[in-house]
C-alpha cells in the first residue's frame, strides 16, 4: 500500500451515550477510544492522525483508519482483530474471553531498530510510530501524565526541600501532549514553573485548557513574574515562547537559579520533535522533508547545548533530572560525555511506587458524561478511605483538570486496589449508577509493562535494564487473562531502539463475565510489575509480593 493518505480535513468525535454503533460494548469500546484519540480536544494534530509525542499516530493512514472503524463495527464477540503498525491486517476466530483487538506497533528486529530504518519504512507506508497510548487507543490528553508528574515533583520536594515547594520554581521545556502536564503538575505540587515552548499553538492549547496560567512576553518578563510569585508564595505557571537550547544557556550565563530543572521536549525524535536553535518551525518542517540527516544533526547539536546547560545547573547543586525523553542519550551521541550525570525521574523519585505495582491506572466514561467520572471519584474515596494524598489528588483533579474528549480520570494505585476499583466500577454499570460502560487502561509507563534503560528501567539494582522479556510477558499474560485489547509497542517515550512496552484496556460493561476478566487482568497486570522488581532484588517488591500472595517460584516459593 502506498502511503499518500495521512492528511484529511475532518473532525473526529467518539459517539456518546449508551446506544451501540458496534455489535457489543467489547467492540464499541475500542471504536470509541480510537475516535477519542483523534478528537481535536485530545490530539495534537488529528488531521494527520498524530495524537501526541512527535509523530505518535492512532492509525497508519486514513484508509487504515476507515477500515479499522468498519471492522470494529462488524466484529463478533468471538473474533479478534489484529492491527499491525496502525493497519488492520486480519480478523480471526478466537473466543468470548479473548481480546477483541491485538495491536503491535513500531516493532523492529533489534539490529534494524533505529530511526533511520524506521523513517524509511514510514515513508513507504510500511510502519507507524505508535508512541505509547497513541497507537493503543487509550490516550486521555495531558491528564494522563499529570499525576505522574505531580508525584515526581512532590517526591522531589520531599527529598530536596523538606516537603514543601512553596516559594520554589521549576524550569522546564516542552508543552506538547506529555510536556503540557508539567505546568499544572507543578502548580498542584505548590511550585511556580517556567515552561519554554517553541510552538505558539501549543502554548495557546495549554492556556485554553487551563494547564498553564499565563504567558510571558519575553525572558525578562518571565523572570520578573517568577520573582514576584515565588516571593508571594503563589504557585503560578508561566509559558514562554522560545527555544530551550537558547534560553537555558542564557539563564546559566545570567546566574539565574531555579529550584528544580527538567525537560519534556520531544527530544526522542530529532527529525520531528526538537527544533534546532536559530530555526523557525517552518524551516524545520520543510528541511525535514528535503534533508533529514542534516535536520537530525542540527537538532541533536542543539540538544547537546540544552543538556550542557542542565549539567551546569546541576553543578550548582540544583536538583536536575531527565523526564524520560532520551535527551541525555542524544546529547551523549553529540559529545557530551557526562550527559548521564543527572538521573532520570524513575530511579530518582518513582521506583518505590513501581515496586508495589503502583502506576498510572486510568479510566474513561464511554457515556461522555462528566457525572459518571465524578461518581467513580467518589467510589475511589469510599473504597480507599485512609489515603489522604490520593483524596487530595482527586479533589485537585476535579477542580483544575479540564476533560479532553471523553471524560476520564488518572489515579495512581497498585496491586490489590486496581482490581477492587475495577470490580466496583463494573457493579456501578450493572446497577445503572453509571449511564454507560467505562474502560480501564493505563499508560505503558507502568511498573511491569516496559523495558527502557534510559527511563523506566534505568539503573535497575541487578543490571537488567535492557532485558525486554518483561513487557512481552505482560502482554501475553493480559491476553491470556482476557483484556479487551492488548498492545505491544517499540520506541515509545525515548525513541527507536530504546524501549519496548505493552498496554492493556478492559471494559466494565456490568456483566458477570466482565467481572471475572477484570479480577484476573487488574490483578495480573500490576502483579507483573511487582514480580519484575522483586526479581531484580528490590526489598519493597519482595515484601509486597509476599503480602499480596503472589506465587513467584524463585522468591516466594
From Swiss-Prot:
- Assigned EC number: 4.2.1.49
Q: Which InterPro entries match?
A: Urocanase, Urocanase-like, Urocanase_C, Urocanase_central_sf, Urocanase_CS, Urocanase_N, Urocanase_Rossmann-like, Urocanase_sf
The listed locations are: Cytoplasm
Q: How is the cofactor bound?
A: Binds 1 NAD(+) per subunit.
Gene Ontology cellular-component annotations: cytoplasm
Instruction: Decide whether keyword Cytoplasm is in the record.
Output: yes
Per its UniProt record, the required cofactor names are:
NAD(+)
User: What pathway does the UniProt record associate with this protein?
Assistant: Amino-acid degradation; L-histidine degradation into L-glutamate; N-formimidoyl-L-glutamate from L-histidine: step 2/3
The reaction(s) this protein catalyses? 4-imidazolone-5-propanoate = trans-urocanate + H2O
Supply the enzyme class, top level.
Answer: lyase
Lineage top rank: taxon: Bacteria
**Which UniProt key words apply to this protein?**
Cytoplasm, Histidine metabolism, Lyase, NAD
What's this protein's name?
Urocanate hydratase
Gene field = hutU
User: In the UniProt record, does the keyword Glycosyltransferase occur?
Assistant: no
Q: Which PANTHER family match?
A: UROCANATE HYDRATASE
Amino acid at each position: 500500500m502506498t502511503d499518500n493518505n495521512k492528511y484529511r480535513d475532518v473532525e473526529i468525535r467518539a459517539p456518546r451515550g449508551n446506544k451501540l454503533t458496534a455489535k457489543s460494548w467489547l467492540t464499541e469500546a475500542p471504536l470509541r477510544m480510537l475516535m477519542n484519540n483523534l478528537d481535536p480536544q485530545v490530539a495534537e494534530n488529528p488531521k494527520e492522525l498524530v495524537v501526541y509525542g512527535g509523530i505518535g499516530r492512532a492509525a497508519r493512514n486514513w484508509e487504515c483508519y476507515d477500515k479499522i472503524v468498519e471492522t470494529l463495527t462488524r466484529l463478533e464477540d468471538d473474533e479478534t482483530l489484529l492491527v499491525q503498525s496502525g493497519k488492520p491486517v486480519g480478523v480471526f476466530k478466537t473466543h468470548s474471553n479473548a481480546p477483541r483487538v491485538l495491536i503491535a506497533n513500531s516493532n523492529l528486529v533489534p539490529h534494524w531498530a533505529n530511526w533511520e530504518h524506521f523513517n524509511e519504512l514510514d515513508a513507504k507506508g510500511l510502519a507507524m510510530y505508535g508512541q505509547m497510548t497513541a497507537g493503543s487507543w487509550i490516550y486521555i490528553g495531558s491528564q494522563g501524565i499529570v499525576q505522574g508528574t505531580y508525584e515526581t515533583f512532590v517526591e522531589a520536594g520531599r527529598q530536596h526541600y523538606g516537603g514543601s515547594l512553596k516559594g520554589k520554581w521549576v524550569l522546564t521545556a516542552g508543552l506538547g501532549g506529555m510536556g503540557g502536564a508539567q505546568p499544572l503538575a507543578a502548580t498542584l505540587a505548590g511550585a511556580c514553573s517556567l515552561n519554554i515552548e517553541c510552538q505558539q499553538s501549543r502554548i495557546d492549547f495549554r492556556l485554553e485548557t487551563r494547564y498553564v496560567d499565563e504567558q510571558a512576553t519575553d525572558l525578562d518578563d518571565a523572570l520578573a513574574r517568577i520573582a514576584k510569585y515565588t516571593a508571594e508564595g503563589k504557585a503560578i505557571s508561566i509559558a514562554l515562547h522560545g527555544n530551550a537550547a537558547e534560553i537555558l544557556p542564557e539563564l546559566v550565563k545570567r546566574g539565574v537559579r531555579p529550584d528544580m530543572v527538567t525537560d519534556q521536549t520531544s527530544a526522542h525524535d530529532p527529525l520531528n520533535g526538537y527544533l534546532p536553535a536559530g530555526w523557525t518551525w517552518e524551516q524545520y518542517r520543510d528541511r525535514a522533508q528535503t534533508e533529514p540527516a542534516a535536520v537530525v544533526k542540527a537538532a541533536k547539536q542543539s540538544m547537546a547545548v540544552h543538556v550542557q546547560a542542565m549539567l551546569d545547573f546541576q553543578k550548582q547543586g540544583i536538583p536536575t533530572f531527565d523526564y524520560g525523553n532520551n535527551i541525555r542519550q542524544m546529547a551523549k551521541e553529540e559529545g557530551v560525555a557526562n550527559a548521564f550525570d543527572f538521573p532520570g525521574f524513575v530511579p530518582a523519585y518513582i521506583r518505590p511506587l513501581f515496586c508495589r505495582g503502583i502506576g498510572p491506572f486510568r479510566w474513561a466514561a464511554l457515556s461522555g458524561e462528566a457525572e459518571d467520572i465524578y461518581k467513580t471519584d467518589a467510589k475511589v474515596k469510599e473504597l480507599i478511605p485512609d489515603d489522604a494524598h490520593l483524596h487530595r489528588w482527586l479533589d485537585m483533579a476535579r477542580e483544575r483538570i479540564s476533560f479532553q474528549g471523553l471524560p476520564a480520570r488518572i489515579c495512581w494505585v497498585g496491586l490489590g486496589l486496581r482490581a477492587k476499583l475495577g470490580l466496583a466500577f463494573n457493579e456501578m454499570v450493572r446497577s445503572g449508577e453509571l449511564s454507560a460502560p467505562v474502560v480501564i487502561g493505563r499508560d505503558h509507563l507502568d511498573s511491569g509493562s516496559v523495558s527502557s534503560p534510559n527511563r523506566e528501567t534505568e539503573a535497575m539494582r541487578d543490571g537488567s535494564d535492557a532485558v525486554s522479556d518483561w513487557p512481552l510477558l505482560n502482554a501475553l499474560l493480559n491476553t491470556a487473562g482476557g483484556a479487551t485489547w492488548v498492545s505491544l509497542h517499540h520506541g515509545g517515550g525515548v525513541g527507536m531502539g530504546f524501549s519496548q512496552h505493552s498496554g492493556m484496556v478492559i471494559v466494565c460493561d456490568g456483566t458477570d463475565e466482565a467481572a471475572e476478566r477484570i479480577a484476573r487482568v487488574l490483578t495480573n497486570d500490576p502483579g507483573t510489575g511487582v514480580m519484575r522488581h522483586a526479581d531484580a532484588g528490590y526489598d519493597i517488591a519482595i515484601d509486597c509480593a509476599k503480602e499480596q500472595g503472589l506465587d513467584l517460584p524463585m522468591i516466594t516459593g
